[in-house]
Design a protein with these regions (language model features):
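Beta-strand-connecting loop/turn residues
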Residues: 46-47, 67, 148
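Short beta-strand segments
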Residues: 20-55, 71
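Charged, gly/pro-rich active-site loop segments
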Residues: 2-4, 78-171
């Protein structure tokens, strides 16, 4: 990371990943070209992250031959005029992680992954989860991304006095 003063620890980065409305997952396709998609991921152990989709498609084909992925999450993204110098800038919280994607084949783990996604994005509707699973499990692909190293975090944020919060300083 070029600006070490903005680096944050892996626990902080995991918090960003849990709060981000989506996480961009980047793959390398069969031709060696980058392929990034914003996906709705969820995890209950901070190591295994799940997403779901159709049983066919480009990302599933890519995973079979190139399972290595990079995840990028951003929260609190706010265009800002620098309080001290009037510069145009952006306040943000971000996380980067690397992992290995695998298509889940066991129904029990598919249900576990889908439950994590449901609890994260639709907790108020979990009473309908079992019915939804009964209807759609056989036509839903679930992918597990296992992080291969702790995520890294980066932040640019100003405090109430307009001073940039550096070197992990918290509010």
């Amino acid at each position: 990371m070029r600006k070490e003063s903005r680096a944050m620890d892996s626990l902080w980065a995991l918090e960003v990943m849990h709060k981000a409305p989506y996480i961009t997952v980047s793959f390398i396709d069969e031709e060696g070209k980058p392929y990034g998609l914003p996906l709705s991921l969820a995890s209950d152990d901070d190591v295994n992250w799940y997403f779901h989709g159709a049983l066919e498609g480009k990302k599933l084909e890519i995973i079979k031959t190139h399972p290595e992925v990079c995840l990028s999450a951003v929260t609190r993204c706010a265009p800002t005029v620098g309080p001290k110098d009037g510069s145009f800038t952006l306040q943000f919280k971000s996380a980067i992680a690397f992992g290995k994607a695998e298509i889940v084949t066991e129904d029990a783990e598919k249900i576990h992954g889908l439950r994590q996604i449901g609890e994260r994005f639709l907790p108020q509707h979990m009473d309908a989860f079992d019915q939804s699973i009964a209807r759609s499990l056989s036509r839903t692909a679930v992918v597990r991304i296992t992080l291969t190293e702790p995520p890294t975090g980066k932040r640019k944020q100003y405090d109430k006095e307009g001073v940039e919060m550096k070197y992990g300083r918290m509010e």
